A protein has these predicted regions:
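Flexible, glycine-rich phosphate/dinucleotide-binding loops
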Residues: 35-36, 65, 127, 152, ...
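Functionally critical loop-and-helix segments that line ligand-binding/catalytic clefts
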Residues: 1-18, 25, 134-175
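Short beta-alpha junction loops
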Residues: 64, 94-97, 123-127, 150
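Aromatic-lined carbohydrate-recognition surfaces of secreted/lumenal glycan-active proteins
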Residues: 115-129, 143
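Substrate-binding cleft of extracellular glycoside hydrolase catalytic domains
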Residues: 1-22, 28-117, 140
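Short, well-ordered coil↔helix boundary/capping segments
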Residues: 101-102, 121, 157-161
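Short, aromatic/basic amphipathic alpha-helical patches
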Residues: 73-76, 106, 131-136, 156-159
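Glycine-rich, charge-decorated loop segments at or immediately adjacent to ligand/cofactor-binding or catalytic sites
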Residues: 67-69, 126-138
Length: 175
């Protein structure tokens, strides 16, 4: 049986927390983007997860350039907000322009040495670009890959991920 791990941000608001909490083993939510943006739902998601004892991950959507500084902004933004059910930090490295590979490597090393779990999120089509980072990621770091196929909200075996992926995002369509 598949498990669903929702990716929540100001783009995908939760309308029924009870339903989400019961259906999902953990929550993933956007915290920051770049060096200045803080997702307006960050506080609400953390509060709801802590109140309901639901594990949650926080991620930074990395704009191109200054990846380490963006990872530090993520941590500084979240450090005083997280609670007992916080799992770890995620770096979302899918921007169109592409992220600096060395910058992603440094940022991943930084978040992976904070005492929490870590994760890197990549797009299927960008695998070659980030392969060296993925292959040498720390032991406490999972790999989340987006490969949508038809992107109709339904999983299809016709669109597998790359070998070694821990979490497969098969749609950007919520339900």
């Amino acid at each position: 049986m598949s498990k669903y791990y929702p990716d929540i941000s100001h783009h995908e608001k939760v309308t029924d927390w009870n339903k989400v909490i019961k259906a999902c083993p953990f929550i993933i939510t956007k915290a920051t983007q770049g060096l200045t943006f803080i997702d307006p739902l960050l506080g609400t998601v953390i509060k709801e997860c802590e109140k309901r004892k639901k594990p949650y991950w926080l991620y930074a959507y990395l704009n191109s350039g200054k990846e380490l500084a963006q990872a530090k902004f993520l941590v500084e933004t979240c450090r005083e907000r997280v609670g007992k059910y916080f799992v770890g930090y995620i770096l979302d490295v899918e921007c169109k322009e592409g992220n600096n590979v060395a910058g992603v490597r440094d940022a991943l090393k930084y978040i992976s040495n904070l005492g929490y779990k870590s994760m890197i999120y990549t797009m299927y089509a960008q695998y070659t670009r980030y392969k060296s980072v993925i292959d040498k990621r720390p032991k406490n770091c999972a790999w989340w890959e987006a490969r949508y196929g038809k992107n109709n909200g339904t999983y299809s075996k016709k669109y597998p991920t790359h070998k070694g992926v821990d979490f497969h995002q098969f749609t950007e369509r919520g339900s």
